[in-house]
Amino acid sequence: MTSYSTNMRIKLPLFCLLLQFITIILFAVFVRYDHESDARGWHEELNNHSSSNADNDFYYRYPSFQDVHVMIFIGFGFLMTFLKRYGFSSVAFNFLIAAFGLQWSTLIQGFFHGFHDGKIHVGIESMINADFCTGAVLISFGAVLGKTSPVQLIIMTLVEVTLFGINEYIILNIVGAKDAGGSMTIHTFGAYFGLIVSRVLYREDLEKSRQREGSVYHSDLFAMIGTIYLWMFWPSFNSAVTAHGDDQHRTVMNTYYSLAACTLATFGFSALLNGEGKLDMVHIQNAALAGGVAVGTSGEMMLTPFGAMIAGTLAGMISVLGYKYLTPVLDSKLKIQDTCGVHNLHGMPGILGAIIGAIVALFATADIYGDGMGDVFPLISDGSRTAKQQSLYQFLALLVALGFAIIGGTVVGFILKLPIFGTPSDAECFEDAIYWEVPGGEGHQQLTVVINNEDPDTQA
C-alpha cells in the first residue's frame, strides 16, 4: 500500500476533474472556430474571394501539426523512459501534462493572439502553438522527473502555461524578436524554469533513491525510440508556424543539416571524453538532438546550410560537455538535481540558438533577403529598425525569457513545496509503484524495498 501523503485517490480526481470542468466552462464562453474552420465563415469566404477548399490553411499546416503532435506525445514521452523503475510515470505523466497543457494553452495563447470581438478564434495554427507551449512544460518536467507527484505536475502546468503565454507575447509582439522554432520561448524558458523549480524542491536525502535513478539496457532502448522520433520530426517543429514558401522550406533545410552535424559531433565527443573510447548512451539519446534547438531562432533566417552545420556541431559539443562535466557540478555545488539533463539538451543549446539568431539578424540586408525581408524581419523591411537594432532586440528577448523562467520557476517551486500535493519522500523517488499498479507481484516487492530503503539490485 502507498503512504497517506502519496495516495492519489482524492487528490488526483479532484484536481483533474475540477480543472477539466473549469476549462470546459471557459471554452464554452470564449472559444469559437476561426473563419477557416467555421462552416458559415469558410463558405462565405469561398463565395466572396473565389477561393477553393485547397486554399484552407489546414492543408498547409496539418502535416506539420501531425509531426509536432508525435514529438510531444511519443518523442518527449519515450525519451524520459530511461529510468529503470519509472517507465509508466515517464510516458503517462507526459501524456497527462500534454493533455491538460494543450487545452489551457489554447485559452492563454488565444487571449493574446486570437481574441476578437470578445471570443478566442481557434484553428490549425492554434493547435500547433498549443503543442509548442506544452513542449516547454515537458522540458521543465524533465528537470523534476521522478521527484514530483502527478498533482504537482498539473499545478506546474497550470502556472507555467500561463507564464509561457505572457513571456511569448512580450518576446514576439512587444520586443519584436523572431523565434519561430522556440530557442528562447520554448527551450530556454522551459529548461531554466524547470531547473529553478528543481532547485527550490532540492532534496537533501535523494541518495536514498539514487539506486533507481539510473537506466538498464531495455530502458535505454525505449528512450532511443523517443530520440529517433524527435530527431526525424524536428524540422517540422521548427518550421510549423513559419510563412509558407521559401521560409518554411529554408527552416526545414537548416534544421535538417544542423541535426545531422550535431549527431556526428555527439558521437565524436562522446567517445573522446570516455577514457576507454566508449560511447555513452545518455549522450546519444540527448545531445544528438541539440542541433534542432540551436537553430530554433535562426532556422527561418538566411543562416546558410554550412552555417546550420556549424550551429549543430557547436550544440552537440556543448551538450556532451554539459552531460559529462556540468551536470555533476549543478548537483553538488548549486543543488540543482536535473534528472534528464535539460540544461544540456535545451538550456545551453537554447541560449546558443538565441545568440546565433542575434548574430544572423545583424547581417540581414536587402541584398541577401530581397523581397523576402518582409516575412523574416518585417520591422527591418518597413524601416522601423536597422539590422543592428534587431540584433540587440534578439538579445533582449533572451534576457526576457531567462527572467520569466527564473522568477516563475521560483514562485512555482515554492507553491509545489506545500505538503498537500502528495510529493514522494526522498526514499520514494524514481519509483513507479508509488503511484501505479505494477503488474504481478513486482509492485509490492518494490514498495517493500523502497520502504526499507534497500537496493533493489541486491534483491533476489
From Swiss-Prot:
Domain of life: Eukaryota
GO terms, molecular function: ammonium channel activity
Residue positions the entry lists as glycosylated: N48
Extracellular side: 32-62, 109-125, 172-179, 242-252, 305, 369-394
Protein name listed in UniProt: Ammonium transporter Rh type B-B
InterPro entries: Ammonium/urea_transptr, NH4_transpt_AmtB-like_dom, RhesusRHD
Segments passing through the bilayer: 11-31, 63-83, 88-108, 126-146, 151-171, 180-202, 221-241, 253-273, 284-304, 306-326, 348-368, 395-415
Gene that encodes it: rhbg-b
A GO cellular-component term linked to this record: cytoplasmic vesicle membrane
